[in-house]
Amino acid sequence: MNKYLEYPEVESKETPPQKLVVLLHGIGSDGHDLIGLVPYIKNDLQNCHFISPHGIEDYDMMPYGRQWFSLRDRSPHIIATLIANNISKLEDIIREKQTELNLTNKDTVIIGFSQGTMIGLYLTLVQQAPFFCTIGFAGALIPPMKINNKLTPICLIHGALDQVIDVSEMYNASNYLSKLNIEHSVHKLTSLAHSIDGRGLEIAINFINTCHNMV
């Protein structure tokens, strides 16, 4: 039983599932937000079980919503410390579902949006065993103190008109990943602000299927 909050999930069309897809929402939202993407992608990912956990903390700047970590202080070193302190709680949620489905990291896809991308990328880089792949929409990279995993392929997708997290953050992340020789791709989407659109979902689906073909 999840000791944090019961979250929405969608079972795979095929049984048993071969992949676990973990959807990580942005700040001030909750798991019900990104689970709404599943109807648009599940037909192309029929062997995937989808979960969309709620952020592990109450959103501390509004009386509703959830967060993975506070953004009251946006200093990079403060954010890195907060993520490091909270990351094990997210890992617990994922491990619990992996155990239930008899899956492991190599069968797990991480998809984040905004703050969910921040914690998703951090989570990916600190794993002892690599995830299948990681996809980040409209986010930024907060590097951990220690990199344990350089093997998970990463796809970054960002709107060119994003005024919440500037698209330059995608290129900052790309430069960092390149220095570590981590396989990744970047996609700047024209006429898109801080959001996910059909183009981004198509890129994500193709990326997951490409990674599958490489295994």
Curated annotation (Swiss-Prot):
It comes from Rickettsia typhi (strain ATCC VR-144 / Wilmington). Belongs to the AB hydrolase superfamily. AB hydrolase 2 family. The keyword Hydrolase applies. It comes from the Bacteria. Its EC number is 3.1.-.-. The active site is at residues 114, 162, 194. This is Uncharacterized hydrolase RT0729. SUPFAM superfamilies: alpha/beta-Hydrolases. Keywords: Hydrolase. It holds the Pfam family Abhydrolase_2. InterPro entries: AB_hydrolase_fold, LYPA1-2/EST-like, PLipase/COase/thioEstase. One of its GO terms (molecular function) is hydrolase activity.
